[in-house]
Amino acid sequence: MNVTKSPAARLGVEQLETRNLLSNATLAVATGILNSPENYSDFVTSEYRHLLGRNPDSSGLSHFLGMLENGVSPETVEAQIVNSNEYVFDHGNTEVGWITGMYQDLLGRNPDANGLNNWLNALANGSSTFAVAAGLVTSQEREVSLIRSDYALYLGRAPRTDEIVSWLSQFQAGANRAQVAVGIVASNEFFALAGKDPSTFITHAYQDVFLRTPSQSEVNFWLSVYNQNQP
């Protein structure tokens, strides 16, 4: 089992650590779990089911897993999926149908007239379909939705306004959704919810991320990572 500690995975961590939100030990474990092949596979499968209404084929799964393992952001993977011929065809093979589908799938609502026209105008003025897809995937509305979902999943509560603003600033500085999730799972609050016990912290992380309980060997592995990153 490999532990991912790429510079990209630590983007924004220094600022968070100065506010006493993270420890190196919980950060190392959270980074490894959320950047694991298992989580990448779960993410791609979930995206296929949600956006394309099917499980990924082996070639598609392998393609996107390779991208994620090479440091491509989850946002880029999601944008590629909604920019695919399959997704466009599933939404009527028209610009209006395609944009409407992305609003519904990514933002949970129909497009307002201004929003729809803005994206149609962008296409008419030469923007690529990928640029439009990426624009919706990385929109502030989408990012706020992801922050709220992560807080509900990992902390069991809604984020405060100042917390939303703080995480949005991380997005604006270049963080992606996986890095934000790492910050939340590595937080003192998540650790406290797990009883401030490293083994329980690992178990809770597995249950929230993978929807399963870790094996004893997995707990032992991540305990060794945790202990290696203690001050």
Region annotations inferred by a language model:
Residues 1-25:
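Subset of Sec-pathway N-terminal targeting signals
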Residues 22-231:
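Composition-driven recognition of low-complexity segments enriched
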